[in-house]
From Swiss-Prot:
Cofactor section: FAD
Transit peptide feature, positions: 1-43
UniProt KW Flavoprotein keyword: yes
Function statement: Accessory subunit of the mitochondrial membrane respiratory chain NADH dehydrogenase (Complex I), that is believed not to be involved in catalysis. Complex I functions in the transfer of electrons from NADH to the respiratory chain. The immediate electron acceptor for the enzyme is believed to be ubiquinone.
Gene3D superfamilies: NAD(P)-binding Rossmann-like Domain
Family (UniProt): Belongs to the complex I NDUFA9 subunit family.
Location of this chain's protein in the cell: Mitochondrion matrix
Pfam families: Epimerase
Predominant place of localization: mitochondrion
Lineage: Eukaryota, Viridiplantae, Streptophyta, Embryophyta, Tracheophyta
Self-association and partners: Complex I is composed of at least 49 different subunits. This a component of the hydrophobic protein fraction.
Cofactor binding, note field: Binds 1 FAD per subunit.
Name of the protein in question: NADH dehydrogenase [ubiquinone] 1 alpha subcomplex subunit 9, mitochondrial
Length: 402
């Protein structure tokens, strides 16, 4: 048997050209060419650190192609994360997935790319060295980390502000990060009645102070298979037979399909750098009141609409005990579903896209209407199966069940 060995040699750049000359990505900072070359693999932001040559854009655009993007996606195991990882992997990007929980938490993401394309990496968001390790080989960083409620270990400020600030500072020190995207929330403001939205606003300011050319995405309430609005509503209705309308159901907002938000993030990476340093407000095409969105939910799960109008003071009183006890008991409390005090505070004001804000259209995208496919996942709550339900006129046949 003849053994053939091959030595992989990194070829120097010709004429001092940047390794990203064929890519639409542009560096956030003026990094000299020698930092992007083979002299210093720490800043090469490519697979050259493993001796397999520089990443180059090639292929037809599928997941077996190479897009030139090596993205570290913080918060990839969450709701939006799975859709973003899927779209990045689909276009041939390598995706590094930091996670801090069980090793099973990112397992479903590995199926979204070719072998070795989606790489889970254990990390600690409070450990700077851990953050540097998961960011070391990336040229794109996307931060999706956020939390709608407090826990014993992470306050609103920890999850939504301090971690985002630390990630931005590490990315700045890295020197080879070409695009940085911070995912915030529509309605983020220092004057918001919601602590989470105030923390998100502080995070935006901290990120832009560290990386002035970072892109800020402000999605509205996201709708999708794993969402945290229509699913809890449906489960509450199936369990108790009615839905509480907090504040009478008159609050206006613009829910958006989660796949559209992921597409907007990818579109910002694909552009010529025109999205750098800008803030986008990503709301759906239609404005709903809480009551109108609940009607869509009832229609989809085929149940008779039954409501109990709950004034804000009563709703806050019902939600307050968890917030009071969260740091006073020696065990974790259940996650709040409908009665989340901070979300109730947020519902006291309308959350709509500003008239002069950059929107989906500025990224050449048209968001889906929240009818049909985007809410089709709710058929799982229909009584008797997907073809039945309480509002269906024909009765379920007696021989339907075995």
């Amino acid at each position: 048997m003849q053994v053939v060995s091959r030595r992989l040699v990194q070829r120097p750049l010709v004429g001092g050209a940047s390794i990203y000359s064929s890519s639409s990505l542009r560096s956030l900072y003026g990094v000299s060419n020698h930092l992007n070359g083979t002299d210093n693999c720490r800043y090469s932001s490519s697979l050259a650190t493993k001796g397999v040559g520089h990443l180059a854009r090639k292929g037809t655009g599928g997941r077996s192609s190479v897009s030139g993007i090596v993205a570290t996606v913080f918060g990839a195991t969450g709701f939006l994360g799975r859709y973003l990882v899927q779209q990045l992997a689909k276009m041939g990007s390598q995706v590094l997935v930091p996670f801090r929980g069980s090793e099973d938490s990112p397992r479903h993401l590995k199926l979204m790319g070719d072998l070795g394309q989606v790489v889970p990496m254990k990390f600690d968001p409070r450990d700077e060295d851990s953050i540097k390790a998961v960011m070391a080989k990336a040229n794109v960083v996307i931060n999706l980390i956020g939390r709608e409620y407090e826990t014993r270990n992470f306050s609103f400020e920890d999850a939504n502000h301090h971690i985002a600030e630390k990630l931005a500072l590490v990315a700045k020190e890295h020197g080879g990060i070409m695009r940085y995207i911070q995912v915030s929330c529509l309605g983020a403001s220092v004057s918001s009645p919601s602590r989470m939205l105030r923390a998100k606003a502080a995070a935006e300011e901290a990120v832009l102070n560290a990386l002035p050319e970072a892109t800020i995405m402000r999605p509205a309430t996201m709708i999708g298979t794993e969402d945290r609005i229509l699913n809890p509503w449906s489960m509450f209705v199936k369990k108790y037979g009615f839905l509480p309308l907090i504040g009478g159901g008159t609050t206006k907002f613009q829910p958006v399909y989660v796949v559209d938000v992921a597409a907007a993030i990818v579109a910002a990476l694909k552009d010529d750098g025109s999205s750098m340093g800008k803030t986008y407000e990503l709301g759906g095409p239609d404005v709903f009141t809480t009551h109108e969105l609940a009607e869509i939910m009832y229609d989809m799960i085929r149940e008779w609409p039954r409501y109990v109008k709950l004034p804000f003071p009563i709703a806050k009183a019902m939600a307050a005990p968890r917030d009071f006890m969260v740091n006073k008991v020696p065990f974790p409390l259940p996650s709040p579903q409908i009665f989340n005090l901070d979300q109730i505070n947020a519902l006291t004001t309308d959350t709509l896209v500003s008239d002069n804000a950059l929107k989906f259209q500025d990224l050449d995208l048209v968001p889906h209407k929240l009818k049909g496919y985007p809410v089709e996942f709710l058929i799982q709550y229909r009584k008797g199966g997907p073809n039945f339900g309480s509002t269906v006129s024909e009765k379920i046949p007696t021989d339907f069940y075995p």
